[in-house]
Swiss-Prot record:
PTM annotation, UniProt: Contains 4 disulfide bonds.
Domain of life, per lineage: Eukaryota
N-terminal signal peptide: 1-20
Protein name (database record): U10-lycotoxin-Ls1b
Propeptide: 21-26
GO cellular component: extracellular region
Main location: secreted
Species in which this protein is naturally found: Lycosa singoriensis
Keyword Lipid biosynthesis among UniProt keywords: no
Gene Ontology MF term list: ion channel inhibitor activity; toxin activity
Amino acid sequence: MKLIIFTGLVLFAIVSLIEAEEESGRVCIPLNGECSKSPDKCCDNINCDCYLRFEKGVQAGRPCFCTEKDVIFERDE
């Protein structure tokens, strides 16, 4: 019984430590990763760029992705 309780406490501590590390900012979003909820978490030398998305003339969201700095994307027609 003590072993089960000890194992549960150890697992809880490990999960808490992982969550604390993610919240502390050590984990960054890689290139082309979505950054809509945390635009300041892109890795070094990467910016969080957002664009408006429309469906049938109505705004349907604002997705954001980590992209290279000083890179400009143009619409291909």
